[in-house]
Structures are given as C-alpha cells and as structure tokens.
Regions:
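Membrane-embedded alpha-helical signal segments
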Residues: 1-169
C-alpha cells in the first residue's frame, strides 16, 4: 500500500534521519494531536537516490506535496525583519514559509544571532516544513479509520452524544 505520509531524502541527508529527526517527528505528532486533535499518521522515511543529495520531498499518499533543500553541515539564518548586516553563506529559502535565508557556517551562529537573525539547524528546517505541510493538508490526512478512532475516544467522555449522533451498526 501507499504510505499516508512520506519523507524522501537525498543521500546527503540520510544521517540526519539517524540523528534527532525521528525524535522531532514524535514531538510534532504529539504537538499536532493536542493542537488539531488529529493524530498525525506515521511518517515513512526513505532515501531516494534520484533526488539531489541535499534535497528532500514530502508526499501524501504518493503525491508530492512539497520539496526542500538543506545543507546538513550548515545552519540556516533567517532575517527576522530586524537583521543588521549581511551574512556570508549560501543563499536559500526557508521552505515552510518561503522566507529568504542564508546557509551559514556554524562558527557564524553567534554573529548571526547578534545581528538579529533566527538561526536553526537543518533538522529543524525539515521538521518545521513537515509540520506546516501536515497543518495545511490535515483534511487529506483525516481518514475514515482516523474518524473511527476519534469517535471511539469520544465515547469515553461523551457516550450519550455519540449514541445520538452515530447510527447504531
């Protein structure tokens, strides 16, 4: 079967997956469950040798929803709107919100933060992008099975309501 939610990574990003990305995804699932009441489906992560090494792709039921690029050895500095001065690095785009960004050497982190840039690691970039894709496509992730689970949970606290609204089978 096709996975509901999938993250494909280029070979340059494989070691990020082995790092704290899995922990971050677990935190996102917890956060979205309390925020949206939606239990995010498990994320299938696979490497895709057809992708350029630093690119990743987010898919829902096999359809590509969005892509992004991160530099695993660098940090992303985003202009908070108040940034003073230009940072040396590789120009880029923060993929979740489309903000201009610069990929900088980790040694420049303090300077970037002193100049009012927001600095994040590549794992955070992917995690934030995934979170926003799930938020924007929550309706597509709400399966019949998921609705059934929500109804079962509701039976615990509001059995009468469920009896009135859901036809007996």
């Amino acid at each position: 079967g096709v996975d509901t939610l999938e993250l494909e990574v280029g070979y340059g990003l494989v070691r990020l997956v082995g790092g704290d990305l899995l922990d971050r995804i677990a935190m996102i699932r917890h956060q979205l469950a309390s925020e949206l009441g939606l239990v995010m489906p498990p994320v299938r992560i696979r490497d895709n040798m057809q992708l350029p090494p630093d690119r990743y792709r987010l898919k829902i039921r096999g359809a590509t929803i969005d892509e992004g690029e991160v530099h695993p050895e660098l940090l992303m500095a985003m202009d908070s709107g108040l940034a003073a001065g230009k940072l040396e690095g590789i120009p880029g785009v923060e993929p979740a919100f489309g903000l201009d960004a610069t990929w900088i050497d980790p040694a420049l982190r303090m300077r970037a933060e002193t100049q009012n840039s927001t600095v994040v690691d590549p794992t955070s970039v992917i995690a934030t992008h995934l979170t926003e894709v799930v938020r924007r496509h929550a309706d597509e992730l709400l399966t019949r099975e998921e609705v059934g689970n929500l109804v079962e949970q509701l039976k615990q606290s509001a059995a009468r309501l469920v009896e009135e609204v859901v036809p007996a089978q």
